């Protein structure tokens, strides 16, 4: 299975990554900073994730696409990427009952939770989703032309995990 990635929050309190709803209870100040990323997109926080029986803010969001590829694509589009550290997770340790793949295809927000957006968390599905998508490339170029900073994971597939994760012994990479 390919690895999964999550950027290291800055600052990160402790060594546990929490979904937003749990973070609010454990670290309210950090929660305020993290939830602010959804300004203007608040409806996402209540988006259902039917395969897991929960909401968008009840899960951790992990990238299937390697951060170096994302950074290289941003640079190719003419965007100076923010430099970040990422945690690297072994996808083989995730409980498939608590994990799902979200394809994140372009659509209106109301349709984002339709059945075609979800895949079971299986190695074969992960293996075919490690590349950047054409909608991501197009979005990055359009943002560059408008001189706007693109969202880092726009239109890229995500892995959603319904639990907190200990990060203490994980490898980190800087991109």
Q: Where are the regions that the model predicts?
A:
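Active-site-proximal loop/hinge segments that shape catalytic or ion-binding/gating pockets
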Residues: 1-175
């Amino acid at each position: 299975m390919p690895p999964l990635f999550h950027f290291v929050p800055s600052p990160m309190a402790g060594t546990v990554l929490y979904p937003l709803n749990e973070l609010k209870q454990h670290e309210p100040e950090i929660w305020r900073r993290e939830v602010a990323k959804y300004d203007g997109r608040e409806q996402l926080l209540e988006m259902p994730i039917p395969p897991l029986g929960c909401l968008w803010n009840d899960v951790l969001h992990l990238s299937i696409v390697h951060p170096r590829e994302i950074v290289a694509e941003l640079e190719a589009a003419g965007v100076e990427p923010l430099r970040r550290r990422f945690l690297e997770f072994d996808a083989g340790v995730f409980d498939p009952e608590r994990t799902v793949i979200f394809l994140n295809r372009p659509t209106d927000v109301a349709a984002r939770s339709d059945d075609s957006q979800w895949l079971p968390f299986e190695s074969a599905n992960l293996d075919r989703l490690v590349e950047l998508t054409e909608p991501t490339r197009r979005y990055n170029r359009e943002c560059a032309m408008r001189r706007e900073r693109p969202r880092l994971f726009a239109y890229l597939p995500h892995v959603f995990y319904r639990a907190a994760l200990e990060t203490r012994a994980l490898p980190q990479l800087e991109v």
